[in-house]
């Protein structure tokens, strides 16, 4: 089983499977995956009009059986039209076969209101979650998909404190109803009294419990006949791949899955031992990052598409061959690789040579800008921070993560209480850190965690299911070329490959922090869902 060590920003770093370290996996994502903070709600930012407009209708919190729910009604202007919707925020009780409570899942569901009688067969529903493990759905919820979003400045960074909540004209609600799911010990979700939270911590356990939530929701809200989609980010894509087969085995066939900043095969991102694959697959993202910071030579800066294609080809040919030679690569052959790798990363030949041709992401983040004090982000390498320890090997923090966590937590807490009318004194766990450890892989002795074969089986058994992969060019957590590699190694037939959509965006792991990418992601998802819907009779 692979073990993993948490990075400072919470993203998982897997190493070779070691029987003595089996149950020490993933201390969260990101993203995302992404040190938990139990932050109190901050006031929403004043504006010329209320940051949160009054709802058209409100209801007091209701209790249905063991479920605590708050149902409110709202409207938003998108694409020049008024979209009315119902929001349900609350907890759903999950019980065992004996009727004993096991957990209370917090969720927020959005349903478009059309004024007509509701026909579930005509309205798709998408179940959305983030990753970690240990991340609540707030990142996608208030960053990309929900009808409200956290206000960002022109650089894609939170404006506060205090933080503002604004309308999101790029909400996915115009294309699909949505259910945002917080797994146990994230958000407001908790294990029931007397139940150990550890019972939910693991690859298989997580798939089973989130899958059971989805089944219960479909039943309780009469959505079995709706076209059904999943959307996951970061480790959430690992979960989504597992769910693709789990749900199918339980009579739930999906129309499509949206994978955002995906990691399905952990061998593609996990440096360690003799695994050279990540060094090959991270390289194009290094080049994209160096280009963004204008560190590449003039020739490479002329045409990014041409440069990226050139680097990708070199990575899987000359570079891969050179790494495969190991210590036998010497003399002029080694010198040629050092020179090319230095050119494509903008690092010095001396650094490349001393790194033995293998540049770890953390080292690249530290060295790219030249002095060790200015560092680039891991989740988005466009962003720059100042490291207080310039001589250390790894960055002290991730500027593309630390700027966001308090903002998302406080904004979501205020949104849940003030707008969705869900009352809870629990801290909203945007990123639960050690609260989901240890994370069981449940696959002892089987090498790196790899759920790509699981997804491939589901695609063969459900050949109408479509999949979409979305990646950012400057993501140094789940690099885009690793996703390309995984897709091309799923052994899909030509017909099934037609069901795969591949999308690229400016930005990093949370590419939706870039306004243009947020708009493009919205359009791409709407088109994807429309194409995956059954043909009208």
Identify the role of each PLM range:
Residues 42, 47-59, 99-199, 488:
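N-terminal cap/lid subdomain of alpha/beta-hydrolase-fold enzymes
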Residues 64-116:
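N-terminal cap/lid segment of alpha/beta-hydrolase-fold proteins
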Residues 147-151, 247-343:
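A catalytic-pocket lid/entrance helix-loop region that shapes and gates access to the active site
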Residues 173-176, 183, 200-218:
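Alpha/beta-hydrolase active-site loop
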Residues 222-235:
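Alpha/beta-hydrolase fold nucleophile elbow
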Residues 325-477:
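Alpha/beta-hydrolase fold catalytic core
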Residues 465, 479-489:
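Short alpha-helix in the alpha/beta-hydrolase fold that links the catalytic acid
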Residues 506-517:
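Catalytic histidine-centered segment of alpha/beta-hydrolase-like enzymes
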């Amino acid at each position: 089983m692979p073990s993993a060590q948490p990075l400072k920003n919470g993203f998982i770093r897997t190493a070779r499977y070691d029987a003595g370290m089996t149950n020490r996996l993933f201390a969260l994502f990101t993203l995302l995956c992404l040190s938990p903070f139990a932050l109190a709600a901050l006031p929403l930012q004043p504006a010329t009009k209320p940051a949160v407009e009054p709802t058209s209708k409100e209801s007091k919190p209701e209790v249905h059986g063991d479920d605590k729910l708050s149902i409110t009604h709202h409207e938003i202007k998108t694409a020049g039209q008024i979209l009315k919707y119902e929001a349900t925020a609350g907890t759903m009780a999950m019980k065992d076969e004996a009727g004993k409570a096991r957990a209370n899942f917090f969720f927020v569901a959005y349903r478009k209101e059309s004024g007509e009688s509701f026909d579930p067969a005509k309205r798709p529903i998408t179940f959305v979650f983030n990753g970690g493990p240990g991340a609540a759905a707030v990142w996608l919820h208030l960053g990309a998909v929900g009808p409200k979003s956290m206000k960002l400045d022109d650089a894609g960074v939170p404006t506060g404190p205090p933080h503002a909540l604004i309308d999101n004209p790029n909400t996915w609600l115009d294309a699909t109803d949505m259910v945002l799911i917080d797994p146990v010990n994230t958000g407001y979700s908790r294990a029931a009294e007397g139940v150990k939270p550890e019972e939910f911590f693991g690859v298989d356990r997580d798939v089973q419990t989130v899958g059971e939530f989805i089944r219960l929701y479909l039943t309780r809200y009469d959505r079995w006949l709706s076209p059904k989609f999943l959307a996951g980010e970061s480790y959430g894509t690992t979960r989504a791949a597992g769910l693709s087969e789990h749900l199918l085995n339980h009579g739930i066939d999906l129309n499509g899955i949206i994978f955002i900043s995906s990691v399905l095969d952990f061998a593609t991102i996990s440096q360690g031992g003799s695994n050279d694959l990540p060094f090959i697959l991270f390289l194009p993202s290094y080049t994209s990052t160096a280009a963004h910071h204008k560190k590449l030579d003039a020739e490479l800066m002329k045409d990014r598409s041409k440069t990226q294609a050139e680097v990708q080809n070199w990575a899987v040919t000359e570079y891969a061959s050179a790494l495969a030679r190991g210590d036998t690569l010497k003399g002029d052959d080694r010198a040629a690789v050092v020179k090319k790798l230095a050119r494509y990363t903008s690092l010095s030949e001396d650094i490349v040579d001393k790194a033995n041709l293998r540049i770890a992401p953390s080292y690249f983040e530290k060295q790219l800008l030249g002095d060790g004090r200015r560092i680039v982000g891991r989740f988005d390498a466009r962003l720059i921070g100042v490291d207080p320890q310039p001589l250390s090997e790894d960055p002290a923090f991730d500027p593309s993560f630390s700027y966001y966590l308090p903002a998302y937590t406080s904004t979501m807490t205020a949104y849940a209480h003030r707008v969705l009318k869900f009352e809870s004194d629990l801290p909203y766990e945007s990123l639960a850190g050690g609260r989901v450890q240890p994370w069981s892989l449940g696959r002892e002795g089987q090498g790196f965690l790899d759920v790509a074969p699981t997804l491939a089986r589901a695609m063969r058994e459900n050949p109408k299911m479509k999949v979409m992969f979305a990646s950012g060019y400057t993501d140094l957590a789940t690099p885009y070329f690793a996703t390309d590699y995984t897709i091309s190694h799923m052994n899909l037939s030509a017909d099934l490959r037609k069901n795969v959509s591949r999308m690229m965006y400016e930005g990093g792991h949370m590419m939706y922090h870039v306004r243009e990418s947020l708009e493009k992601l919205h359009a791409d998802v709407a088109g994807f869902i429309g194409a995956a819907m059954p043909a009208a009779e």
